[in-house]
Amino acid sequence: MKDYRGIIENFFFILDKETQQPAQFRFNKVQSKYYKLLLEEYTDFQGVREIVLKARQEGVSSVVLAMFTVDFLMVPYSVSICISHRKDATELLFKKVKFFLESYCQNKKIPFENLFKTDNKNLIEHATNGAMFYVGTAGAKVGGRGGSASNILFSETAFYMDTAKITASEIVTATAQQVPQDRGMIFIESTGNSTDDYYNAEWERARRGESSYRPRFFGWQEFYDAAWVEKKKKELPNELLARRVYPKDESEAFLAAGSPYFDNLYLAEMLNNRQQPVAIGRLAADGQFT
């Protein structure tokens, strides 16, 4: 089994979130916790099927892309795919992958330009081992549908738009079929959006144990401190959106569709502050409580 973490932390650089300067890739708290969970669930990293709900910018997509990059470097003929919700987000994710590769080449003293047989805005192909890494944008033409893939990351899936040509469900379902059953890695990762979208439905299916994907939730408290989150929330227009972007629990991560009659914030407060019952039982016909 490959030591993904060892390779990533020893050879990959990433742009520091605060300084935007290159720094050695060191797993943060969420990345460390998630990687440990993956090791426990999938000892050989095969048949990985994960749906991740989290607060903003906790590093989940970064660590998944880094793992795919390790496969690009070390697994001959592997095919990794990343699909994001917007063109600009897709481009940024691909730049991150290329930054990993550039730092790896620098550490290994390999000419970066010699690493690729093909290198364009959507696809890179390894010059010697035949591995490929493809990126696409949800709603655009999804490449390689007829072929097979080793790894797929669906990034910010809750924000995939349903169009007349293709729905979010069709994008994920059709593309995921490229990975053979019980093989490879598929991640569906996102912050929450609406209670009536595909991602929410798939999340609820996973929570009920009706999906092949295992649900993981990482709230803001696993990465940020309370003072930082409160300050960040002031940049957002309302409390509901702030809770969706930085949820403390799963219930805060999705906005109810439409305009609910009852205020969700008050309902949540009532639930959290409810009195515990004095006793629990049944009232019989004779008036006895049992």
Residue ranges and their predicted role:
Residues 1-290:
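Phosphate/NTP-binding elements of NTP-utilizing enzymes
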